[in-house]
Amino acid sequence: MLGLGRVFSSAVRPRTLIRAPINKRSFLWYSTEAAKEEKPAEEKVAETENVDVKELQSKLSELKSKYEAKDKEVAELKGSIRQSLADYRNLENRMKRDMEQTRAFAVQKLTKDLLDSVDNLERALSIVPEEKRNNRESNKDLVDLYEGLAMTESNLMKTLGKYGLVRYDGIGEDFDPNIHEAVFQIPVEGKKPNTVFHCESKGFQLNGRVIRPAKVGVVKGDD
């Protein structure tokens, strides 16, 4: 019985694990191989980073070129707009001048046609003696006619004056061949030589330009 217990005791006794000895050379070989396997991954990361930088540089260069092209295009458009505005202003000014010249020409033709009517009204008024104009009781019809003609002439000259027509006689002024036409010259006592002392027909200027000179008598100087 005692012998059976020993056999059973030795049968259930746990076995002791024995660690195999580590070979240093094998460990170094495994470490080197692992390092060799890890190195290509690092190189791939570096290569990927290099590729990303190059792509960014390429995109930046492309964007810069596009920006410069757009900037140039905008500058050209601005220049075209400025030129178009300048051309428009020049055209507008030219059209304005042409319209003014056309208007002035039309007014000049109209006023020249009306000068005879103005002269006739003036002559009609000048032939009525002053004493009869001032005596309404005896010459009522004549005075009424005179006042009607005077009002007609005044209104006509005001209307023509709106378009730049000016009437002048030149009496007392120095003779100017640009605005006066001398019809005779005589010595006049107390008058300055070469001055206008008489007007046969008045002159007219339209917007500063003579359309008919005044026909005048001029004081003659001593020879």
From Swiss-Prot:
Keywords of this entry: Chaperone, Mitochondrion, Transit peptide
Example of a GO cellular component annotation carried by this entry: PAM complex, Tim23 associated import motor
Keyword tRNA processing belongs to the record: no
Coarse class of the protein's main subcellular location: mitochondrion
Gene Ontology terms for molecular function: adenyl-nucleotide exchange factor activity; protein homodimerization activity; protein-folding chaperone binding; unfolded protein binding
Record localization: Mitochondrion matrix
Domain of life: Eukaryota
InterPro entries: GrpE, GrpE_coiled_coil, GrpE_head
Family annotation (SUPFAM superfamilies): Coiled-coil domain of nucleotide exchange factor GrpE (SSF58014), Head domain of nucleotide exchange factor GrpE (SSF51064)
GO biological process terms, semicolon-separated: [2Fe-2S] cluster assembly; protein folding; protein import into mitochondrial matrix
Biological role stated in the UniProt entry: Essential component of the PAM complex, a complex required for the translocation of transit peptide-containing proteins from the inner membrane into the mitochondrial matrix in an ATP-dependent manner. Seems to control the nucleotide-dependent binding of ssc1 to substrate proteins.
Family statement: Belongs to the GrpE family.
Assembly: Component of the PAM complex, at least composed of mtHsp70, mge1, tim44, pam16, pam17 and pam18.
This protein's name: GrpE protein homolog, mitochondrial
Organism of provenance: Schizosaccharomyces pombe (strain 972 / ATCC 24843)
Annotated gene: mge1
